Amino acid sequence: MPEQQKYFSTQDGTSLFYRYRPAADGSSDKAIVLFHRGHEHSGRMMFVADELGFDDFAYFAWDARGHGYSPGERGDSPSIGTSVSDVDDFIRYIQSEYGIKPENICVIAQSVGAVLVSTWLHDYAPKIRCAVLASPAFKVKLYVPFARTGLKIKQKWRGNFFVNSYVKAHYLTHNVERQKSYDNDPLIARAISVHILLGLYEAAERVVADAQAITTPVQLLISGSDWVVHHKPQHDFYNRLGSHIKERHILPGFYHDTLGEQNREIAFVEMRRFIRERFNQPLQQVDLTQSHLFGDSRREADELATPLPVCSPRGAFWATYRASLKLGSRWSEGLRIGQETGFDSGSTLDYVYRNQPQGSNAFGVWVDKYYLNAIGWRGIRQRKVNIGKAIQTASAKLREAGKPVHVLDIASGHGRYVLDALTADTLPDSVRLRDYSPINVEAGRKLIAERGLQNTVTFNEVNAYDRANYHDLQPRPTLGIVSGLHELFADNDLILNSLYGFGEAIETGGYLIYTDQPWHPQLEMIARALTSHKAGSPNWVMRRRSQQEMDQLVEKAGFEKIHQWIDEDGIFTVSLAVKK
C-alpha cells in the first residue's frame, strides 16, 4: 500500500508530521507505531514495516518536535514532558482517526524514542498490546569528564543552548548504506538542545528507578557494542520491570542503530515472534487493585513507616532535620502552618497555592521562599493548573452534549483550585464543595463570599468516604472531582468507597477528574520529617500508586480515562474519565 504523509495536532495545538501505511491486506484493526531515535525522523524508521513483513498491520511513524518535517527548532522541544505528552496524543489520535484501539497497538521505539516511550508507559499507563524497545538511551555516553555537570552549570549561566552530536555514522551501524544515507540526509538534526539532553537524563533515571510500575509486555533489544549509550541502565530497567511478560535480547557486535544494523535480521526474527505471540493472545493486564496489601509500593511504605534507631546516623540526621524545621517555623509562615496544621492539610495546600513567601523577618521570608520552591510544592501548583484544564475540558464536553455542568468536589481543602478555575463565561450551573475539616469549610466559605459566588457555589462539611453521602443528590452531579485525597490514604478498599459513590451519583456520559502521585523524589524526607493532619498518623507516610493502579480503581467504579496531564517532574497526574 502507498505511504501517506499527514499531520496530527497535539494538545497545545502543534501540528506534527507522520507517515501512515495502511495494512496491505486491508485490515483496519491493528497497528504498529514507530518512534525514531534522536536526531532522526520517520523516514528512517518506515523500513521496519518492510523488515517485519506483516500485511495485517497498519504502520505509523512520526517526526518528533524539532525533527524531520515537524515544526520547532531542530533538536529541541519545550520539554521532555511535552514530547512524552505528544506520544500520548499520537496514540489517542490514531484511535480517534483510524478506530484502532490502544490494546491493538504495538509500539517499536529506538534510542531516545525508546526513552520517550518508556516514560509514557510509566507516566500514562496506556493499555497497548506490547512494546519493543531497541537500545533505549537511558544514559548517553558523554566522554568528556564531568560533562553533564558542566552542561548544567553552563545552562544556568547562559540559558538553553545546543550541542552537536559527536557520533559518526560508522559508529551507529556496520551497514554502509545506512551510513551513507545518514551522512547525506538533510533532515538529520545533528544538534540537540541542552535542556532536552539533561531532561532526557532526568526522565530516564526516574523511569529506570521505578520500572516496576510498567506492566506492559516488553521486548528489550540491547546492542552489544554500543558506542553511544551505557548498558547498565538498560539492564537495571529490565530487571525492575513489573511486566509479567518480558524478554531481553543482547545482540553481540551490534552498534547503536540496532534496527538498522548489518545483521538486523537477528533482531527482527525475535521481534516478529514476540509481536505475533502477543497478538495471538488476549491483552495481558496485571491486576494492581490489591497493591495496598502486597507489592513494591506496600513494601516501600512499610519501610518508610519503620522507626529508625535514634543513635544511628540516619536516625540522627532526620532528628536534626525535624528540629531545623521546627526552628524555622519561628520565622517562616509556611513552616509554621505546616507544624500547626500538618504539612498535608488543606491550610498548607492553600498556602502553597498562593505561593507568596511570608515570614516574621527577612530571613524568614528567605526560608519561606526556599520552602515554597521545593520540587513537591512546584508539582502541587502545576497540578492546580492541570485541574483547571481538566475542568474546562470536561465542562466544554458537557456543554457540547447539551448537558448541565453540576460539579461535586468531595475533598476541596479551601476550594481555591476549583474557584480559580471558574470564569464568568464558563460558570457551571452549580458547584458543591465538600471537606471533612470544619477549618477548611469555614475558609472555603469565606473565599466563596469574597468572590460573590454564593448563588452558584456551596461548601459543606462531609465525609468523602461514607457511601451514604453520595445518595439522592439533587441535582445529580455531572462532573466529579477528587484531588489530593486518595494520595493520603494507602487502603484501596477505603478509596473505592468514594469512587463507587461517584459511580452511583454520576450518570452515564458524566465525567470524573482524579489525581494521582505515581512518583515523588522526596518520599523519605516527607515520611521522616513532615507531620500529618490525619488522626492517629503523626508522620506523613505515603504509599505511591502507579498510574495503572489508580486507573484500574477508577475503572472498577465504572469510569474510563480519556485524557491525562502530568507535571514536568512526573510527580502528580490529573486524569479525566467518562462514566460508561
Question: What residues fall within each predicted segment?
Answer:
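Catalytic nucleophile-loop/oxyanion-hole region of alpha/beta-hydrolase
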Residues: 39-42, 68-103
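Conserved alpha/beta-hydrolase
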Residues: 49-73
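Short beta-strand/loop motif that positions the catalytic acidic residue
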Residues: 214, 220-222
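Short alpha-helix in the alpha/beta-hydrolase fold that links the catalytic acid
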Residues: 216, 230-239, 495
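Catalytic active-site module of serine/aspartate enzymes centered on a nucleophile-bearing elbow/loop
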Residues: 252-301
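Class I SAM-dependent methyltransferase Rossmann-like catalytic core
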Residues: 332-399
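Class I (Rossmann-like) S-adenosyl-L-methionine-dependent methyltransferase catalytic domain
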Residues: 374, 382, 389-393, 416-425, ...
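A short glycine-rich, Lys/Arg-flanked "PGG" loop and its adjoining helix->strand segment in the class I
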Residues: 496-508
